[in-house]
Amino acid sequence: MAIRIVGVDLPQNKRGEIALTYVYGIGRSSSAKILDKAGVDKDLKVKDWTDDQAAKIREIIGAEYKVEGDLRSEIQLNIKRLMDIGCYRGVRHRIGLPVRGQSTKNNARTRKGRKKTVANKKKATK
């Protein structure tokens, strides 16, 4: 039986600490804290969890962590706020350039997208 936490099916054959990282917003350190609070061994595989353990983990995540859709929407709202107030970071987001001060002369391809080839100027004939 697949264990479903906040809309994500956890992989059955992985350790609990790793499996919880499949939820957006939970990393290794957060998953270790969650399992400690729930009293579940972090080396125990997900398929060996009892229903009570899974319910306790669900309860902890629901009460203390912002994950999945809520977290994604909060991040989007933060970026939208930056764009609306017109600050430097917001402008960089709006025009699709790196936000954190990286150089754009040669690199920044991830942010800028594929190269857009520009035609050369034709030489003037004498």
Swiss-Prot record:
Pfam families the UniProt entry points to: Ribosomal_S13 (PF00416)
Molecular function via GO: rRNA binding; structural constituent of ribosome; tRNA binding
KW tRNA-binding (keyword) present: yes
Keywords: Ribonucleoprotein, Ribosomal protein, RNA-binding, rRNA-binding, tRNA-binding
Alphabetical GO biological process terms: translation
Classification via InterPro entries: Rbsml_uS13_C, Ribosomal_uS13, Ribosomal_uS13-like_H2TH, Ribosomal_uS13_bac-type, Ribosomal_uS13_CS
Biased composition regions of type Basic residues, renumbered to the chain: 108-126
Function: Located at the top of the head of the 30S subunit, it contacts several helices of the 16S rRNA. In the 70S ribosome it contacts the 23S rRNA (bridge B1a) and protein L5 of the 50S subunit (bridge B1b), connecting the 2 subunits; these bridges are implicated in subunit movement. Contacts the tRNAs in the A and P-sites.
PANTHER family: 30S RIBOSOMAL PROTEIN S13/40S RIBOSOMAL PROTEIN S18 (PTHR10871), SMALL RIBOSOMAL SUBUNIT PROTEIN US13M (PTHR10871:SF1)
Record's protein name: Small ribosomal subunit protein uS13
Source organism of this protein record: Bacteroides thetaiotaomicron (strain ATCC 29148 / DSM 2079 / JCM 5827 / CCUG 10774 / NCTC 10582 / VPI-5482 / E50)
